[in-house]
């Protein structure tokens, strides 16, 4: 593993990334491609934990905007992340990759409850661990979950796989042709420039625990491998 920069990582996988161009639900070919890439990285000996979002199924903020109580809407979103986690687990295990799903909301019939020491032990036994259910509390995003779990398991970095976006820009590249991509930023840059890579709570948690972030395009084959090897892909965020 001499050519590996990050030996233990959290991959933040958005729900939208699993939907692909469909924009809603799960796109089976996309799910299969992600699983294949994870298998290749896993075979290098990299310890992988994954935090999945649920935006391809439901967004708590959207539910609240429609008049639903925010906490209730967020709980629905947590259930959406669990559906995505089980789908990803199935895709990985179809490729003979050992996995465990841990949920922040107990549902022992289908997944383990989140236990930090057990999660670390699974990683040490070369199992991919998929964290689902967010933090288990409303008002917290899955980005915050990624930062929290990364700190808890002592991850070397958070890999933020984006759907069709190859890094961090000073404006939305899909709307502004003059948008400029950043290769390197600090955590404080994210907060001061209001760059919307992750919410402020997640950014602060990552900064306080000195956890690097790498934002990259998940849709480009081989990018996860390039990131764990420390190659120049996307935008790297580190330092205060």
Swiss-Prot record:
Pathway: Pyrimidine metabolism; CTP biosynthesis via de novo pathway; UDP from UMP (UMPK route): step 1/1. UMP binds at residues 54, 74, 135-142. It catalyses: UMP + ATP = UDP + ADP. It comes from Limosilactobacillus reuteri. Residues 20-25 are annotated as: Involved in allosteric activation by GTP. SUPFAM superfamilies: Carbamate kinase-like. It is an enzyme of class 2 (transferase). Allosterically activated by GTP. Inhibited by UTP. GO terms for biological process: 'de novo' CTP biosynthetic process; UDP biosynthetic process. This is Uridylate kinase.
């Amino acid at each position: 593993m001499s050519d590996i920069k990050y030996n233990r990582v959290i991959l933040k996988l958005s729900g939208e990334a699993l939907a692909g161009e469909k924009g809603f639900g799960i796109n089976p070919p996309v799910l299969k491609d992600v699983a294949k890439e994870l298998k290749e990285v896993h075979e290098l000996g990299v310890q992988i934990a994954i935090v999945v979002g649920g935006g391809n199924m439901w967004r708590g903020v959207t539910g609240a905007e429609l008049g639903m109580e925010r906490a209730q809407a967020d709980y629905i979103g947590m259930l959406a992340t669990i559906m995505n986690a089980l789908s990803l687990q199935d895709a990985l295990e179809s490729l003979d990759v050992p996995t465990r799903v841990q949920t922040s909301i107990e549902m022992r019939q289908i997944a383990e409850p989140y236990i930090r020491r057990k999660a670390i032990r699974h990683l040490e036994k070369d199992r991919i661990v998929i964290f689902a259910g967010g933090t288990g509390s409303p008002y917290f995003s899955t980005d915050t979950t990624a930062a929290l779990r990364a700190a808890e398991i002592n991850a070397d970095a958070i890999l933020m796989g984006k759907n069709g976006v190859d890094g961090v820009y000073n404006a939305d590249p899909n709307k502004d042709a003059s948008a400029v991509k950043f290769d390197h930023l600090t955590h404080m840059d994210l907060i001061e420039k209001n760059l919307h890579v992750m919410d402020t709570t997640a950014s602060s948690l990552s900064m306080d625990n000195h956890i690097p972030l790498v934002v990259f395009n998940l849709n480009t084959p081989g990018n996860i491998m390039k990131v764990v090897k420390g190659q120049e892909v996307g935008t790297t965020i580190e330092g205060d």
